[in-house]
């Protein structure tokens, strides 16, 4: 097959695409149920477990951060799962089979991770830093590794599905609605978690905490699994254009992982955007590992109240996601909108530190709301830019690459946040200064992201991508 053949095939497939129905608003919101479930699960892992392990079980923040971040470090599997969903259908579908099976595994694994967490706490309390404690820490880490693999298997094909079922004229609407639903999930998760944990006070007995957390990790994952099925059933069969857009969709015996990596490396802009996303996500989410402990230690919030902080920032993010695509990006453009988001995020970090020094809870909550707005602006602009840098020919592959950058950065941000907090405690021996160091480092990273963004060129990517893919496939598929 020559590059000329590939181009000819694409032209022939244009008429086929006309036969697919357009997504309506109801379907877009239905797709959002899947993302809503992911948002709810994120509250359980970073909004609840980190608080319990650090504050209630007295596990060092560095160990907690490393353990919780392990699921993010399974991100290289995203490229593999993306490539697999491009080339090897599962349960008869390119995307849906991976999404459903992955959802079953990550919801079930979350509950087993909690049980391993209790064993770590019990062993540490009874035996100290013994072989038994290290064993259970290893088991806990293994649970999060499985969780990360299952999450990658499910979420990467879902993101690729969004490319498959949308066109240029409605893709921004799909992204805006679906990612807004992600924030709705975070808000729902925060409020629901707070309600289910309302009887758990600051000095509640560990047995009470354990029963409440176990119930939480039974009820919420079950709901998330239902959301995953409701949000995606029948979508791929009715709306996916992948088979008509891609010449490799049915050539699973010939398209290898090596071919996939060559496609990714063929364009200079791929590496530049990967680096930008990596630094941006680290800086944006470094505070995740320390925010709830910060609220508990500096403002003396119980678990039920600190968990609700996700709702405060989540509402801001939801507003940012829902309005940026209509009010900001059309006027400023994607790159300038990203720069504004980075600056606003830095300001929010400064205000969070000021609130701690002054002890003003109202300033803290206002800063969190501003952080949410800035995160919504940044996310909308970054996702729109990401779709401009995704070739429909190999959507799963490129989505996997961007997912790799995002997930690895999220994992590393958790580690950096926890380690920086511990380093700050040793350097200053004052909790407020230690937490302030984390937020300061995050702000510096946001400014660095602006400089990296200036090197990203969408037009260069688009000019080179089609030719590079056709050339590589010509050599690999013949």
Regions found by a protein language model. Give the residues of each.
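Intracellular loop-helix junctions on the cytosolic face of multi-pass helical membrane proteins
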Residues: 1-26, 130-145, 149, 153-159, ...
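Short amphipathic helix-loop junctions that connect adjacent transmembrane helices
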Residues: 47-63, 289-306
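Loop-to-transmembrane helix entry/capping segments in MFS-fold secondary transporters
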Residues: 61-62, 137, 168-177, 303-304, ...
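Helix-to-loop junctions at the C-terminal end of transmembrane segments
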Residues: 76-92, 320-336, 421
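Cytoplasmic membrane-interface "Motif A"-like loop-to-helix N-cap segments
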Residues: 87-105, 329-343, 430
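Intracellular juxtamembrane helix-capping segments at the cytosolic ends
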Residues: 153-166, 377-391
């Amino acid at each position: 097959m020559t590059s000329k053949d590939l181009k000819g095939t694409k032209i022939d497939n244009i008429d086929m695409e006309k036969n697919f129905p357009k997504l309506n608003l109801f379907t877009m919101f239905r797709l959002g149920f899947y993302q809503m479930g992911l948002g709810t699960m994120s509250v359980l892992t970073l909004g609840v477990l980190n608080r319990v392990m650090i504050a209630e079980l007295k596990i060092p923040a560095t160990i907690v951060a490393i353990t919780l971040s392990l699921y993010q470090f399974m991100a290289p599997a995203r490229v593999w799962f993306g490539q697999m969903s491009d080339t090897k259908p599962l349960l008869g579908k390119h995307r849906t089979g991976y999404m459903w099976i992955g959802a079953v595994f990550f919801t079930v694994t979350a509950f087993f991770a909690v049980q391993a967490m209790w064993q770590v706490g019990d062993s540490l309390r009874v035996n100290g830093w013994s072989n038994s404690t290290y064993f259970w820490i290893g088991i806990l880490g293994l649970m999060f590794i499985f969780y990360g693999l299952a999450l990658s298997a499910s979420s990467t094909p879902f993101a690729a599905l969004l490319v498959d079922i949308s066109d240029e004229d409605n893709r921004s609407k799909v992204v805006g609605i679906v990612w807004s639903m992600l924030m709705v999930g975070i808000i729902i998760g925060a409020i629901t978690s707070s309600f289910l944990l309302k009887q758990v006070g600051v000095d509640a007995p560990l047995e009470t905490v354990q029963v409440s957390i176990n119930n939480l990790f039974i009820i919420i994952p079950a709901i998330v699994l239902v959301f995953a099925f409701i949000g995606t059933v029948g979508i791929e069969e009715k709306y996916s254009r992948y088979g008509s857009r891609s010449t490799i969709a049915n050539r699973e015996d010939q398209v290898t992982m090596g071919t996939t990596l060559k496609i990714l490396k063929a364009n200079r802009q791929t590496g530049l955007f990967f680096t930008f996303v990596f630094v941006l996500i680290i800086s944006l989410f470094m505070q995740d590992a320390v925010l709830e402990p910060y609220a508990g230690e500096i403002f003396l919030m119980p678990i039920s109240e600190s968990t609700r902080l996700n709702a405060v920032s989540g509402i801001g993010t939801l507003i940012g996601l829902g309005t940026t695509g209509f009010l900001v990006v059309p006027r400023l453009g994607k790159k300038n909108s990203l720069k504004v988001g980075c600056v606003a995020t830095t300001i929010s970090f400064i205000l969070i530190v000021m609130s701690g020094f002054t002890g003003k809870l109202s300033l803290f909550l206002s800063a969190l709301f501003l952080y949410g707005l800035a995160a919504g602006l940044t996310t909308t602009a970054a996702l729109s830019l990401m779709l401009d840098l995704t070739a429909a020919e190999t959507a799963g592959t490129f989505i996997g690459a961007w997912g790799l950058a995002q997930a690895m950065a999220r994992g590393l941000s958790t580690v950096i946040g926890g380690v920086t907090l511990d380093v700050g405690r040793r350097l200053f021996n004052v909790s407020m200064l230690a937490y302030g160091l984390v937020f300061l480092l995050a702000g510096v990273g946001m400014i660095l992201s602006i400089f990296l963004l200036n090197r990203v060129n969408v037009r260069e990517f688009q000019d080179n991508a089609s030719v590079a893919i056709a050339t590589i496939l010509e050599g690999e598929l013949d």
